Amino acid sequence: MAVFLEAKNAHAVLKRFPRANEFLEELRQGTIERECMEEICSYEEVKEVFENKEKTMEFWKGYPNAVYSVRDPSQSSDAMYVVVPLLGVVLLIVIALFIIWRCQLQKATRHHPSYAQNRYLASRAGHNLPRVMVYRGTVHSQGESSGHREAGNNPQIVMGPSRGGRTTVRLESTLYLPELSLSRLSSATPPPSYEEVTAPQEGSSEEASVSYSDPPPKYEEIVAASPSADK
């Protein structure tokens, strides 16, 4: 059964469908010569494209030789249509990963300060710590009561910041004014000098009469001296 169609209807039926690389064909329109060199073409496909027997035979005579011949160097530019988009996508991915890494690093450094900042904060906190001094003495003040005078012999703790005033605190948690601690320190006797410490001290008459160079007393002398002491 023969079917005859007009030219317009025949072109509609025998239309050419796009290949898998339709996107690249939109960038660079292909020809039958390049397509047949990239793929294996049949005689019917070439005939449908040229729609002319003379042109079809002319192409078909040279086609077997073109399959095994070296391709034109200009056709190597077709690979650029594949390589350039892939490189662009890879570059965008690398830039996005770098931006994400920088954001994460800034968040980490914001929550955890650096080692230098930690040392600065630690040294600054160490300077603000209070100083504690424990001493014994008696508080002398006109406005102090008798109960305070009796408790003056107890150990005292002086606390105060390194840069501010000092306060005096008793072990029984009794607070005194800073002036009392200052008066205590001003009225305290100075320590003895080296000459006073090394000078020979005068003892009692009994200690002076004893000579350590004499021999010890005998047993008879001790026994004779004990009855007289009992009497």
Swiss-Prot record:
It is a single-pass type I membrane protein. Residues 201-212 have a biased composition (Polar residues). It is found in: Membrane. SMART domains: GLA. Disulfide bonds join C36-C41. Residues 20-65 form the Gla domain. The modification 4-carboxyglutamate is found at E22, E25, E26, E33, E35, E38, E39, E44, E45, E48, E51, E54, E58. Residues 20-78 are extracellular. SUPFAM superfamilies: GLA-domain. Keywords: Disulfide bond, Gamma-carboxyglutamic acid, Membrane, Transmembrane, Transmembrane helix. Residues 102-231 are cytoplasmic. Residues 1-19 form a propeptide. Residues 140-165, 184-231 are annotated as: Disordered. This is Transmembrane gamma-carboxyglutamic acid protein 3. It comes from Mus musculus (Mouse). The lineage of its organism: Eukaryota, Metazoa, Chordata, Craniata, Vertebrata.
